[in-house]
Structures are given as C-alpha cells and as structure tokens.
Amino acid sequence: MAREYSRVDRIGDQMQRELAQLIQREVKDPRVGMVTVNDVKVSRDLGYADIYISLLSTEELTEDSPEVQDSLTVLNKASGFLRGQVGRAMKLRVVPHLRFHFDKLLGQSRKMDRLIREAVGDKPAVPRDDNDDPVSDNPERDA
C-alpha cells in the first residue's frame, strides 16, 4: 500500500525550497534571470531530480527563447555546485543528479486563460438581479 506523501515527495518538496534559495543567493551569473522553481520530481531511487523552472519576464517565453536557453545552460552547468549545496543543507547521503527544464505549464495556462476570456467576452459569469436579493438593508421594502 503506497503512502500518500512518500519520502521521495518530501525530498522533492524540500529540494524545491533549498534550490529556490540557492539559485537566488548563490548563482551570480547575469544570464540567469528571475528564476522560479515550480516543481521538483525526484526518481524513486534518488538517482535524478528533474527541476522545472520558469522565468519572470514581460513577454511570453517559450522553451526556444534565448533567455530561457541561457538560464538553462547556466543552471545545468552549475548543477554540480547546487547538488553539493543541497546535499549539505538536507544532510542526504545520496543526492540526486539535477536536471533543469523549462516549465511549459505556465505558458499553457496563460494561453487557456486568454482563450476563455475571448470566448466569454465581457459577459458576467452569473446575471445579477437586484430584486432577488434575499437580505435587504431597506426596512421599507421588508415591511
């Protein structure tokens, strides 16, 4: 019977917090923009950890954007340093190899949101009728 919150899940969550702080404080390369660590998926044998990141930007970014490619290159090259720091912070005997990926989910959710707004337009979700208000502050109306 599988547990709801396994050790691998707990390690992934803790790695996400540690990596977010390390990238913000320790990685000094200017090619790395404002990185957000969205998710960490750790393999069952703790051999690998896939880290999904997104970048803060004013424009829509894709995996092929130069900013994204530069950030991924720097982070993958710094993965050995980051792996050592994570291992020391978490006191793990076996520290997974880190693989950084661009998280496409944010772009897909923005696209879905835009499509929904275009389909719905300016229509309110529920038409409102002031006469159907069950609670009234007007005592004359209640009398």
Swiss-Prot record:
| Sorted UniProt keywords | Cytoplasm, Ribosome biogenesis
Purpose of the protein: One of several proteins that assist in the late maturation steps of the functional core of the 30S ribosomal subunit. Associates with free 30S ribosomal subunits (but not with 30S subunits that are part of 70S ribosomes or polysomes). Required for efficient processing of 16S rRNA. May interact with the 5'-terminal helix region of 16S rRNA.
Which superkingdom does the taxonomy of this entry point to? Bacteria
- Matches recorded under HAMAP family: RbfA
Source species, please?
A: Marinobacter nauticus (strain ATCC 700491 / DSM 11845 / VT8) (Marinobacter aquaeolei)
The subcellular location is: Cytoplasm
Subunit annotation: Monomer. Binds 30S ribosomal subunits, but not 50S ribosomal subunits or 70S ribosomes.
PROSITE patterns documented for this protein: RBFA
Gene3D superfamilies (alphabetical): 3.30.300.20
Name the family: Belongs to the RbfA family.
Q: What is its main location?
A: cytoplasm
Any one Gene Ontology BP term: maturation of SSU-rRNA
Q: Region labeled Disordered — which residues?
A: 119-143
Q: Which Pfam families match?
A: RBFA
Top-level taxonomy: Bacteria, Pseudomonadati, Pseudomonadota, Gammaproteobacteria, Pseudomonadales
Name of the protein described by the UniProt record: Ribosome-binding factor A
PANTHER family of this UniProt entry? RIBOSOME-BINDING FACTOR A, CHLOROPLASTIC-RELATED
The leader peptide range reads: none
